[in-house]
């Protein structure tokens, strides 16, 4: 059976891995997932990720989770725009997470980026997820 929400699946794997104090989690690779992980790494929510390719043309992303004093850096990670209900915002209505302590990740015409980058570049888009 086909996966209906691949990005939501990746976020759930990260959330579950952090709850179980795993050092890393893996997920099937895609360009969107890699761009979201780029933003999470740039913002300091994960240590990094690497792409592992298999011989049959499939690839997997291995995500290294980050902890600070034994607690996960990611307290909350949630999907906002879902396959059944897409959420689009203009630059003026980009939501703040936890009064600016967290980030919102958006897919814009200029690429996948964090909320503060979208405000700087004056661009709106689809709200993919929020992280705190």
Swiss-Prot record:
Pfam families: Ribosomal_S8. The keyword DNA damage does not apply. GO terms for biological process: translation. Part of the 30S ribosomal subunit. Contacts proteins S5 and S12. NCBIfam families: PRK00136.1. Belongs to the universal ribosomal protein uS8 family. One of the primary rRNA binding proteins, it binds directly to 16S rRNA central domain where it helps coordinate assembly of the platform of the 30S subunit. This is Small ribosomal subunit protein uS8. The gene is rpsH.
